[in-house]
């Protein structure tokens, strides 16, 4: 190995990573307009905290009942949308993707995006858990195919066989997947999320 090869190392491009995560948040808001209610509640909560002495620095709580029309949504997900796209292998079968909100907290929400249609018997359909940070207006992949807690950078080789920039690649893949849903997908479910303001 040459001296130049030894000195070459991966450096994190934080600006690019944050831009990818911010763009993913915007894509998710377009795919699931229901998420705007979570974002609005978070911003109102932040504004209420800074509004003055009447709040005494306490951030007001809101619960799922503030968002969900009781009984109108499935028990396993607070909000679910499904999209269908044409198959990339051209066999005429539609590829279905489901996006579900699985957790809601004051400033964050957790979503799961999974491909329901198996395109190939040799490849598992992808699945990603996404954390949305409503106060920071960003979204990042926190788990992919059962792997989680990704570091920003890995040494190579490593025991898990991750790429040096595994986290960036997963967030980039998420962006491409969401873009595909926006461009070629059609929603199979109408919005079921009702805000009780």
Task: Give short role names for the model-derived ranges.
Residues 1-94, 98-108, 179-197:
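Eukaryotic low-complexity, non-globular regulatory regions
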Residues 85-87, 112-118:
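Short beta-strand segments that buttress and anchor functional surface loops
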Residues 115-196:
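An exposed acidic His-Trp-rich patch
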């Amino acid at each position: 190995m040459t001296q130049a090869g030894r000195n070459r190392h991966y450096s994190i491009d934080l600006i690019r990573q944050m831009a990818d995560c911010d763009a993913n948040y915007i894509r998710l808001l377009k795919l699931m307009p229901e998420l705007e209610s979570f974002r609005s509640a978070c911003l109102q909560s932040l504004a209420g905290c800074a509004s003055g002495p009447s709040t005494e620095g306490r951030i007001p709580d809101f619960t799922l009942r503030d968002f969900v029309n009781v009984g109108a949504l499935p028990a396993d997900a607070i909000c679910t949308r499904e999209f269908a796209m044409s198959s990339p292998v051209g066999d005429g079968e539609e590829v279905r993707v489901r996006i579900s909100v699985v957790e809601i907290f004051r400033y964050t929400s957790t979503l799961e995006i999974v491909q329901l249609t198996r395109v190939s018997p040799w490849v598992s359909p992808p699945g990603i858990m996404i954390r949305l940070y409503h106060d920071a207006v960003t979204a990042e992949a926190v788990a992919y195919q059962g792997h989680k807690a990704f570091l920003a950078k890995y040494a190579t080789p490593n025991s898990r066989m991750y790429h040096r920039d595994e986290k960036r690649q997963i967030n980039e893949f998420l962006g491409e997947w969401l873009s595909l849903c926006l461009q070629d997908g059609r929603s199979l479910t109408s919005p079921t999320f009702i805000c009780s303001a």
